[in-house]
Regions:
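Active-site ExK catalytic segment of metal-dependent nucleases
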Residues: 76, 83-92
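Hydrophobic/aromatic beta-strand patches that form the interior of the parallel beta-sheet core
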Residues: 12, 61, 83-85, 127-129, ...
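Conserved nucleotide-binding/hydrolysis micro-motifs of P-loop NTPases
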Residues: 18, 67, 91, 133-135
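Accessory nucleic acid-recognition modules appended to NTPase machines
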Residues: 1-81
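Short mixed-charge
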Residues: 106-125
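Mg2+/Mn2+-dependent nuclease catalytic core
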Residues: 90-111
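Switch/connector loops and helix/strand junctions flanking conserved nucleotide-binding motifs
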Residues: 21, 94-96, 135-139
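Domain-level recognition of nuclease-like catalytic cores that cleave nucleotide substrates
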Residues: 129-152
Length: 152
């Protein structure tokens, strides 16, 4: 396909505890299986973003392009603004997540420089939502936001 960017609806449990209960495993298990816990964390973040952004008619989708770059979530607002978002449990994954988001932004800029029509809007925000304690803006402009900072 010649399509540069694909976006679609993000599907998840309305409550991530359903996935935990359905697995039949105790919560302590997930402390030893961080990959599975990461999926549950992502589900929790999307649920919260969906709830908090609904006040502003925000819509949630995902991003995947022909270069196999992905963003865990795209938050779209009615005014056309959007944020590319990655979800990472720990601080050790923030650098890689930020690099992915910056690469997507670079590709959008590159696409627009070629004079393609229609041009693509660059992301208004690049965000990594984490399970860490502190919120900050990195020197490259990526915002790192703990899930505990999300509010309606």
């Amino acid at each position: 396909s010649a399509t540069a960017i694909r976006s679609g609806k993000k599907r998840e449990f309305c409550d991530p505890s359903i996935a935990v209960a359905a697995s039949g495993l105790n919560p302590e298990y997930y402390m030893t299986d961080l990959q599975s816990f990461g999926f549950i964390f992502e589900n929790l973040c999307i649920r919260d973003l969906r709830a908090y952004s609904s006040k502003y008619d925000g819509k949630i989708s995902y991003y995947h392009d022909r270069y196999n770059l992905e963003a865990d979530c795209v938050l779209h607002l009615r005014d056309g603004k959007y944020a590319l978002i990655e979800f990472k449990l720990g601080s050790s994954e923030i650098e890689e997540a930020s690099s992915h988001l910056l690469e997507i932004k670079r590709l959008v800029k590159e696409y627009n420089k070629k004079g393609n029509a229609p041009s693509l809007r660059e992301p208004d925000l690049l965000i990594v939502i984490t399970g860490t304690e502190f919120a900050y803006r990195r020197p490259d402009g990526v915002f790192v936001i703990p899930i505990g900072c999300l509010r309606g």
